């Protein structure tokens, strides 16, 4: 199991990952930006070009185009004054089926199975309930030594949602046109 502070998921490709899901663009503390942040790096870090340099009260700062912002959180590590964490609007998402290893097959990417889960520390009861539901179903149905991704691949994603009782929504459909069937996930060279 892995955790990550945003959907970029540097936590890796664990069997189950719990990630923070930001739902609002960052709030900028303009007084600190010029002293703390290297502005060109922050602008370059945004995957959708939603951040641009600005002057606020005569000081160099940054501004966010909220229509473009996808709330990924990539701007926060290089510029902490761009606070994206929010007690009310930051939610949790659970991803399943990742595997970096290529010992028995190619590596697999995680898939979103639950999103918009309330972020209620310190025990996170809603997230814990979803993870327990997944683990209980996995324990009952998986073969010995079968990883989560192998189990899901064997039964299929529709059966996974059916067995776990998790709701299937339009956000679970991988419809990104830029992906190929394998996303060249294998470490083997192909010509």
What are these model-predicted stretches?
Residues 1-191:
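Peripheral terminal and linker regions in Fe-S/redox and tRNA-modifying enzymes
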């Amino acid at each position: 199991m892995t955790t990550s502070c945003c959907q970029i998921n540097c936590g890796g490709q664990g069997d189950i990952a719990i990630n923070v899901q930001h739902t609002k663009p960052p709030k900028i503390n303009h007084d600190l930006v010029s002293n703390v942040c290297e502005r060109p790096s922050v602008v370059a870090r945004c995957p959708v070009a939603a951040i641009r340099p600005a002057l606020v009260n005569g000081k160099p700062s940054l501004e966010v185009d909220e229509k473009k912002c996808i709330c990924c959180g990539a701007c926060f590590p290089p510029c902490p004054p761009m606070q994206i964490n929010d007690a009310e609007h930051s939610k949790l998402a659970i991803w399943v089926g990742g595997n970096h290893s290529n010992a028995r097959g190619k590596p697999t990417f995680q898939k979103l199975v639950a999103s918009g889960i309330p972020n209620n520390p310190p025990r996170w009861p809603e997230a814990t309930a979803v993870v327990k539901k997944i683990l209980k179903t996995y324990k009952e149905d998986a073969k010995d030594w079968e990883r989560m991704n192998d189990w899901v691949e064997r039964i299929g994603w529709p059966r996974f949602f059916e067995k776990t009782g998790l709701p299937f929504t339009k956000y679970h459909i991988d419809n990104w046109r830029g992906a190929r069937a394998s996303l060249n996930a294998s470490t083997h060279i192909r010509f």
